[in-house]
């Protein structure tokens, strides 16, 4: 079989409400996932064993890497003896709240499912995805906007995309998920907006009036600890964003812009200092 190259796209979170802590140590949450065009590229080639190379020397390529773990979990699930050589061109920043590692893992599951002629259904692969990470099912199963509950693995496809230009900025701070969950300002039990319904409405009409309802429970703690992240958030609003927010647990921040001109101007203000991405309205991961 010839080599295959595939993009693995990142995501942002439109709102993120942490609703409680579970007995297993995980937290329940509600969020809206939205894809962005920032992506890694994975190349898969036939091989006798599972191996990996990466353009970013800071990322391990041993058994701790999510790509290797995904390949091995699928190999064990299907009982196949085939190997694969994976080359990862890493462009999505890690420790950014953009789900880059989760997207890579989901791409490995999806591609190797066909590469190894396993042909399992998405429902079959879902348990493997959950074990790899709470965000992995989104990248495996969805294309555009999706509501997520549970630990992020209970998904509802909203069959839509964001109607705005999305500027995403990585302020060069790597924030661990463990730190974020240990420091966010808890407000369990408080009333929350129905973000599933609101997001479905917003995607169709581009109404900016209710965007402020999409709060991120990590944001205030991250802004207190990492002033550079707060500064980028302020800069995006000053550049004309109708809404700006932390993505996930950070440190990436995004702004939603109504015009391409405003979005490009915002990008120009940031790209001299930080990695940036511009995603067009209605973007889908399966384009």
Swiss-Prot record:
It holds the Pfam family GHMP_kinases_N. Keywords: ATP-binding, Isoprene biosynthesis, Kinase, Nucleotide-binding, Transferase. It is an enzyme of class 2 (transferase). InterPro entries: GHMP_kinase_C_dom, GHMP_kinase_C_sf, GHMP_kinase_N_dom, IspE, Ribosomal_Su5_D2-typ_SF, Ribsml_uS5_D2-typ_fold_subgr. The active site is at residues 11, 135. GO terms for biological process: isopentenyl diphosphate biosynthetic process, methylerythritol 4-phosphate pathway; terpenoid biosynthetic process. GO terms for molecular function: 4-(cytidine 5'-diphospho)-2-C-methyl-D-erythritol kinase activity; ATP binding. PANTHER family: 4-DIPHOSPHOCYTIDYL-2-C-METHYL-D-ERYTHRITOL KINASE, CHLOROPLASTIC. Belongs to the GHMP kinase family. IspE subfamily. Catalyzes the phosphorylation of the position 2 hydroxy group of 4-diphosphocytidyl-2C-methyl-D-erythritol. HAMAP family: IspE (MF_00061). This is 4-diphosphocytidyl-2-C-methyl-D-erythritol kinase.
